[in-house]
Amino acid sequence: IATERPQTRVYATDLSSKAIALATRNRDALDLQDRVELIECDLVEGVPAELAQSFSVLVSNPPYIPTSVLEQEVPAEVKGFEPKLALDGGEDGLDVYKRLLEVAPRMLLPGGMLCVELYEGHLDKAAHLAEEQGIWESVEVKEDLTHRPRILVACLAK
């Protein structure tokens, strides 16, 4: 995002110290230290409080594979490469997404956008959960680069 949008400042968070270490190497290799801050924390817990309601966009690729699918359908090479923490989204694959719905309104500017990659079999349920909140001006499902429905985009009411 920081490479594609040179005018932006990016705060990236992850629970995994290994993910933060890899992101740090990538950020440094791209010479983005002045615009990309990496924080090892759960969701937005480590983001400075004074930044509340200051973000235009919140992007997340949370663990979204339902536990039963992870155990039965995910190829061994994926499970062997990625830590379970990065894949297992709980019983319905929406555990972290539900938490994002709680914290996103605190972080986003009015009219701000939440973009979340999710398991394609649960996008309708995810959209319904967002719509039930009654605070999103629009909730849409978008395709990923392989033309599969995978991204939920919700715009906070202004």
Task: Give the predicted meaning of each segment.
Residues 3-156:
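S-adenosylmethionine
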